[in-house]
Amino acid sequence: MGLVSGSVQFIRKDPDFTEKPYNINATLTAGSNDRLDGSLEAEFGGKYGYVRTNISHNEADDYKDGDGNRIHSNFKRDSQMLQLGVTPTENTTIAGTYERSRAKVAYADRMMDGSKFDRDAWNIRFTQRNLTPWFSELELRYGKSEIDHVMDTYSLRTIYNPAGKQIKNANNPKRNTDTGRLKATFDWDKLNLQTGLDYLDDVHVARNERGGDGYSHKPYMPNQSFKQWGIFTEASWQQTDNQRWVAGLRHDQVKAHYDTARVTDPVLKHQKFNLNSGFLRWERNTDNGLKYYAGFGIAERAPNYWERLRSENKAIRAEQNRQIDAGVIWKRPNLHASVSVFGSNIKDFIMMERQGMNFGVRNINASRFGGEAEVKWTFAPNWEVGTSLAYTHGKNRTDGKPLAQTPPLEWNNTLAFDNGKFSAGALWRVVAKQNRYSKGQGNIVGQDIGASSGFGVLSLNAGWKFSKYATLQGGVDNVFNKTYAEFVSRGGDPSAGTQTMRVNEPGRTAWLRLQAKF
């Protein structure tokens, strides 16, 4: 569910050419199972503009689990990004970005593989900073993207029916999205205010083939479409040097439409969701290195494409999550410790479940609570030891059962050495067995299959910074070649079909990485 009393945004910053007119970062990784990863990030520019590019390649063959069984898991992905920016003044940026990726992936836990994952996207951004002493920034973004997926039973595998004939089925969903965003930032003495609105126009079409491979000659058929408008505001008030309050509100209107002729009920065919979300967060720092925080939030979301696809003739209500969280962080020169806890009540949780040979969707009431504790100690120069513990408990209150796809107790232990030139590390990951499951229930990514066994996995790594610009790293994951599987499914694109089995993770794998920065 995530924390609703706060959020983190990952934003690609404008490049900084204060020290030099370029920045280059190149990485090459090779490993077991014919793994090969490579990436190049480069940016060049000056006072009035810049160009930035990112090129990456990732591929691997099927891996073997700890028992030596080959797991159908090969993949290949290539992606490129090009961004051009113009900075006519020190406070103005106009940037255009194009991103492209092509991929294919084999799924061991499903009856179909992703033989085509094509994505093309572009966006343009205008930013004006320091308009007035209190009007800090105005930002406008617009973007378009197209995603074209193909899932089939024959490109990356060969399967036969009882009569000995090859099974050839394919699904080809396609998605076109337009997005826009306007945001203004204001700063006063102790108050920061961000407010704006955003827009999403999302259109889905699809085509399929049963008993052949001729889907590409068929026309796309309308499937679903969504239109969403949102307005938001977030304020941060530095009440004192040691105390801060953060609050936010958001309202969204989502219009969801079935374009397929299979849905004839006008109440279901055209649905409108008015969604309200908000949070309040308190933070306090003390002079002895302690930081306290607590928050409360409410988040609502409408059913997404995949959930609506499984419930074409049934009204699904929006999901509402009410959550509280609190924690404490303690920082000393050689010690870092933190404890956090949360509790949430989810009304109309959108759950997928197996119904005979098919899957259905319904709303339930659910609850979750859990916490995490972590300690890191620098016990000697260049040496650090750490440990962390995390647990989540989920309950389906409607059925009186465990909430599906809830991970078990996990305990991580680390030991690291780094003197600036040489480094080494060890990670011992211990995961408890999970007996709290609800077979056949879950979400769009995966469903509970049954209980899972506990496991412990040790991984080692080392590094050598042999020059000012380059570092060589290597490691071995799952050193003792343990056979194990995660409880929560991680493999699922929902369009690849129904999860049918739990898949073992890789056995012992080795890797070597060369990284250079200029």
Residue ranges and their predicted role:
Residues 8-11, 15-19, 25, 36, ...:
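Periplasmic-side early beta-strands and strand-to-turn transitions of outer-membrane beta-barrels
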Residues 28-32, 46-48, 57-61, 100-104, ...:
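Transmembrane beta-strands of outer-membrane beta-barrel pores
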Residues 49, 53, 136-155, 283-297, ...:
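Membrane-embedded beta-barrel scaffold of Gram-negative outer-membrane proteins
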Residues 60-61, 77, 91-138, 145-177, ...:
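Flexible loop and strand-edge segments within Gram-negative outer membrane beta-barrel domains
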Residues 67, 71, 193-290, 302-303, ...:
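Signature of Gram-negative outer-membrane beta-barrel scaffolds
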Residues 124-126, 281, 327-329, 334-336, ...:
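Outer-membrane beta-barrel "beta-signal"
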Residues 238-246, 252-254, 341-345, 362-440, ...:
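Gram-negative outer-membrane beta-barrel transporters
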Residues 345-347, 380, 430-439, 463-518:
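C-terminal beta-signal and adjacent terminal beta-strands/loops
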